């Protein structure tokens, strides 16, 4: 049925002179789906980075944990956890009709979590020499996520891939900043793991010739 539907749409588009647009749209959908698992895994790793900042609070009783989560480290941990979940959700939405627009919303949401309203603002409140650098790095992650969301809105694999590459680079810079702050160091490794997966997804979308193609099982 799906093949028949594409044939009918192709014939209609050829009649109206829009066959190029149709081919581009179909190709974009397939390309985005190829990067789906990298986004889901990368988002999951970033979510674990947030969990690393919340690990101490999770071992406390309810009242003590509630107070710890309200501290700058806890607020940043919750924000990073929510941002990672939103990035993973963006990858999952590629499966559905209209999924690229929904994925763009999710990526924009992740940018809000990293930006000045939550993560960056909380990091700036930490009383540590490297806290200001970490806050600036979080803002850079938010900016890169915004560019990625724009690429998704435009259904542009190249722009989305470039955006994800920028997100990966800024996540690594954030991890470097976290290494300099003892309170944040526990989250650095997971941020780097997430950056690696997002970079792989960006390479798929950007059409990096060095990116190995995965063989799909043959259907009979």
Across the structure, where does each feature detected by a protein language model lie?
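N-terminal chloroplast transit peptides
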Residues: 2-20
